[in-house]
């Protein structure tokens, strides 16, 4: 499908400054791929999804998990819960003709329940936990630094975005002790759901399926 418009290359190199995509080979054999024709998983790709967003012909697409989700929803032995990112309830309405930014929280929850999800959660809850963890971590680092421990790395940077963490790992490997050690809200919710919440509800962990509806493709990479 690729028409060699090179929009993916431009957004990857000039906007995101990742540099994972470029033109390789020559003439009729030219293609857009990572350097040395490496697999995308072996490249500097951060899975931010911007190349997919700007591709005008659908030559680049994300991995689709719809069939897997439908199988879980149809399985009576599974308890399927879903978490939605705050951005989703603000952006979803535009797809249905509502003014940009219109909140559709109630409609979204109703629709998800009608689709077959057993429980619907807001990732805001897990985001609060992440903020508490990051706050405790920065207080700990500052306390140690003020007590004379000069090995403490400051400032502390958030680890909420998997694309950002991936970018940092590839481009600043000598500073990996600067980002927070806290999990992202998505991952923190998954841990809480499969331990504390599952125990409280009396649901066996192996029967629980946690689904995330997120605005960023990097969340798929993070789950894998």
Where are these regions (language model features)?
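Short N-terminal signal/transit or membrane-insertion segments
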Residues: 11-15, 22, 55, 88, ...
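Glycine-centered flexibility sites
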Residues: 27, 49-51, 58, 116, ...
